[in-house]
Amino acid sequence: LDLQEAISQSCDVYFYNLGEQLGISNISQFAREAGFGQRTGINLPNESKGLIPDKDWKLKRFGQPWQGGETVITAIGQGYVTTTPVQIARFVSALINGGHLLRPQLELNVSPEVQSMLPMEDKHRKFITQSMIHTVQSKRGTARSLRMQNATIGAKTGTAQVVRLSEEHENKDTEDIPYLLRDHAWMASFGFRDNASYVVVVLVEHGGSGSSTAGPIVKDIYEYLFIEDS
């Protein structure tokens, strides 16, 4: 399984191994430079910074040393990691706009404000966007339900664990698990058609699987957007 297929099929084990090789310092440094763990500056009150953990944070917060197992779960965005939909949207926007991390705006006709650049080479940024497109177009891609005629969609599904489930619940279907214990469902995406481009990020709290819960919402949004454009 190569990196593109690991992204397309959402293979946690691949990223466990990659995270172990990179180490928590490299992971946390990249995430912060990519805009996570800090406010985006959107003109809304009470924006959350989210959290990108590292060894120093854990020692200060809990008085305990960092454990190797915490690195591998951080590598897939679990554990102590918290992010917001607008942070994810800004990151995806940077993937498709040349690497510019923009301050999110609610007003129309406002000139974009570049805050910083993604800390990656263009070839790596383009590889990620192509892998997200592959996630939609591949027969085994977790976002294959987003395929549309006359439009190019790229996406990444996500499932964020809320709590560690007890043996009583861990093998149950989502609908059989108490609501507040269910995973959060994510889908981050971009879409192109003619001269129009969009970023759509959906979080369904306690929604279970990203592909089955957030996916249909994302597709409905694109169908509306592209109908409006035409």
Which residues are covered by each model-predicted region?
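Beta-lactam-recognizing serine transpeptidase/beta-lactamase-like catalytic domain environment
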Residues: 1-201
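Short, gly/Ser/Thr-rich active-site loops of penicillin-recognizing serine hydrolases
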Residues: 112-116, 129, 216-230
